[in-house]
Amino acid sequence: MLAENLVEEFEMKEDEPWYDHQDLQQDLQLAAELGKTLLDRNTELEDSVQQMYTTNQEQLQEIEYLTKQVELLRQMNEQHAKVYEQLDVTARELEETNQKLVADSKASQQKILSLTETIECLQTNIDHLQSQVEELKSSGQGRRSPGKCDQEKPAPSFACLKELYDLRQHFVYDHVFAEKITSLQGQPSPDEEENEHLKKTVTMLQAQLSLERQKRVTMEEEYGLVLKENSELEQQLGATGAYRARALELEAEVAEMRQMLQSEHPFVNGVEKLVPDSLYVPFKEPSQSLLEEMFLTVPESHRKPLKRSSSETILSSLAGSDIVKGHEETCIRRAKAVKQRGISLLHEVDTQYSALKVKYEELLKKCQEEQDSLSHKAVQTSRAAAKDLTGVNAQSEPVASGWELASVNPEPVSSPTTPPEYKALFKEIFSCIKKTKQEIDEQRTKYRSLSSHS
C-alpha cells in the first residue's frame, strides 16, 4: 500500500515541470556571456603569446648581434697582440742593430785615431828626412865650392898644362870614364828615393783619411736615423699600453652588456640600453628637422586653436609639404644609423609617425568633403571674412603666419565648444613624440651612469 502511494506521488512529481523558463534563460545568457569573455580572454592570451614570441625573437637577434661583437673584439685583440709581438721583435732587432752601429762607430773612431797618429808620425819622419836632405845639400854645396874657386883662378902655368896633357894621354878611354861619371851623377841617392816613397805613402794615407772621414760622416748620419727610428718605436711601444687598456675596457663593457641582457627579462628598449650614445642620430641638428618644427608649432596651437574653414586647403598643403620634407629627413637619418650599425628608436618613431600621418590625411579628406557639401554662399562669406581678417592683420602686422590666419577664420560647421578632430590628433602626435624623447633621455642617462660606474 505504501509502495503504491510512493509510486503515485513519484508519477505526479514527474508530470510537474521541475525547472523555470526564466531561470533557464538567465542561465543561457550567463553561459553566452561566459563564452564571450572566455573567447576575449583567449584572443588576449593569443596576442600576449604572439607578443612574447616576437620579443623572444628580438632577444635572440640581439644575442646573436652581441656574440658577433664579442667575436669581432676577440679578433681585434688577437690582431693587436700580433702587432705588439711584431713591434717587440722589431724593437729588439733595432736595439741589436743600434748596438752593432755603436760598436762599429767606436771601432771606426779608434781606427781614425790610429791613422791620425800614424800620419803624425809620418809627418815627423818627413820633416826629419827633409832636414837631413837639406843638410846633405848644404854639405855637397860646401864641397863643390872649392872646385869652383879653382876654376875661377887665372890660367895655370905651363907645367900644369903639361901634367894635364900627360894624364889625358894615359886615359885612352876617356869617353867611357865620362859616361860612368855622368851615370853616377844621374842615379838618385837612397835618401831621395826614400823621400819619394814617403811622399807617396803620405798621399795614400791622406786619401785613406779622407775616405775614413766620409765613412764617419755617413755612419754618423745612419746613427742619427737609427736613433730617430728607435725613439719612434719607443713611442709606439708606449702607445701599446693605451691600446691594451682600451681593449680591457671594451671587454669589461661586453661583460656588462651580457649581465644586463641576462638580468633584464622584459624587453623594454633593450637595444637602446646596449647601444652607446654615439650610434644614435641626434634629434636636434643644425638644419631644422621635422621634430623641431612640430615642437615649435605646439605653443602656437595651444594659444590659438585651429578651426576648420575655407583656408583648410592652405593648411593641408603646408602640412603635406612639411610632412614630405620631414619624412625624407627621417629616411636619411635611418640610412645613417644603419650605416653606423646602430639600433635606435627612430624606426619606432617613424612607424608611429606614418600611422599618425595616415590618420591626419583621412581627417583632412573628411574636412574637405564637409566643406564641399556646404552651400556656396557660406563658402563665399567665410572667404570674405578671411580676406577682411587678413587685411586687418596686414595693416596691424606686416608679417603673419598661416597658422594664425587659420586660427582667426570662423568655423561654419562645427560649434565653438567641440574641438576639431585634427586638434586631438596633433595632441596625440605631440604626446607620442614627448614620450619617445623622454624614453631616449632616460636610456641615455642610464647608459651614462652604467658607463661611469664601469
UniProtKB/Swiss-Prot annotation:
InterPro entries: CDR2. The keyword Phosphoprotein applies. GO terms for cellular component: cytoplasm. Disulfide bonds: none annotated. The keyword Chaperone does not apply. Keywords: Coiled coil, Phosphoprotein. The modification Phosphoserine is found at residue 311. Residues 134-153 are annotated as: Disordered. Residues 44-142, 192-265, 346-380 form a coiled coil. Belongs to the CDR2 family. This is Cerebellar degeneration-related protein 2. It comes from Homo sapiens (Human). The gene is CDR2.
